[in-house]
A protein has these predicted regions:
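Residues forming the flavin
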Residues: 1-211
Length: 211
């Protein structure tokens, strides 16, 4: 089993934080339109992006959103996030009709004002009006974010063979193991998994070597 993250920059394979969409950024397809609830479940947003032309989309945000998140600022510093002074310039970069993109943005801003998204039922506790530039955009597509499958371990981080026996001296933790999370996982749980079983594997492997 794998978990897909919806917004990974291609070809750098840089994961673009959900903080961008959570802060009010929107997803735009190659027709210059929104196509999904940007902050819905990862698998749903990923599937929606893959259904778009060429299987990718653009994240569109403004200066206010960039200023709210140091990760986003980092994307700009390394050249992944592109900056534009107007929507017309953004449309040129995306190769979409500027009038269509402006209409998409006008609709979005009206949804923010009304706190209601009749198209995709987005939550509006953190939505932002995007009428003011400058604007920033980055192209993204879904990418593998976490693997839930792997070797079986016990509570001592010892790897178990296919016959159910402990393999002496072999320890494992994290994404190379399976059975810890089932078919999906929550980020905080995965961190706990890596920390707890990682420390256990390190301690027990050191003890084993010292025998």
């Amino acid at each position: 089993e794998i978990q897909i993250h919806p917004t990974v920059h291609n070809p750098s394979s840089t994961m673009v934080t959900e903080g961008a969409r959570n802060a009010g950024a929107i997803l735009i397809n190659t027709s210059g339109k929104r196509f999904t609830n940007e902050v819905y479940y990862r698998d749903v947003v990923s599937a929606a992006i893959l259904e778009q032309d060429q299987g990718f989309a653009y994240i569109l945000m403004n200066q206010e959103i960039v200023d709210s998140n140091t990760n986003i600022q980092g994307y700009y510093k390394i050249g992944l996030l592109k900056k534009f002074d107007s929507i017309e310039e953004v449309a040129g970069f995306m190769k979409v009709d500027a009038a269509v993109l402006q209409d998409t943005l006008d609709k979005w801003n009206s949804y923010v004002a009304d706190k209601n998204d009749p198209e995709f039922s987005s939550a509006f506790d953190w939505r932002r009006d995007l009428s003011q530039g400058p604007y920033y955009t980055i192209d993204v597509s879904p990418g593998i974010h976490h693997t839930m499958g792997g070797v079986v371990i016990n509570t001592n981080s010892e790897v178990i063979s296919t016959t159910g026996e402990i393999i002496p001296g072999l320890f494992a933790a994290g994404e190379v193991t399976g059975g810890v999370h089932g078919g999906n996982r929550v980020g905080g749980n995965a961190i706990t998994d890596c920390l707890v079983f990682g420390m256990t594997a390190g301690k027990n492997s050191a003890t084993y070597v010292g025998k």
